[in-house]
Amino acid sequence: MKTVKMVLAALLVSASTHAFAANPVEFWGCKFADGYDMSDLMAHTEAFNKIVDDLPDRKYSAWIMTPFFSNNMSAVDFWWVGAWDSNTNMGGGFDEFLAAKDGAAWFAKYQAMSNCEVHTLMTSTNIRMASE
């Protein structure tokens, strides 16, 4: 019985590992342009969410992150981090967003509000999920 439990546990771990395939994660490290601050950005994210809510692709997650500790605390004011479940959905999501009625205008304002000198696309593989 112990062997059966071990095999089942191994299969579950294997299955859950395969469920978390490598996925694209985009990072924008940004400083606020003169006259803008976090309250402006958060208001702008409300407009972003309204645009994205009207798109057929629901495979995008996004976070605003602010430095809590860094070896260079003045490098960025915030990070915009976005993630998709696949490269295919990332490409489709970009196309849908920029083709949306207000998508390109939203992005132009985002660029006016911030100077994002850091723009990186990475592949992320989840190696551990938090337990309850």
Predicted features along the sequence, with ranges:
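Non-heme di-metal
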Residues: 106-107
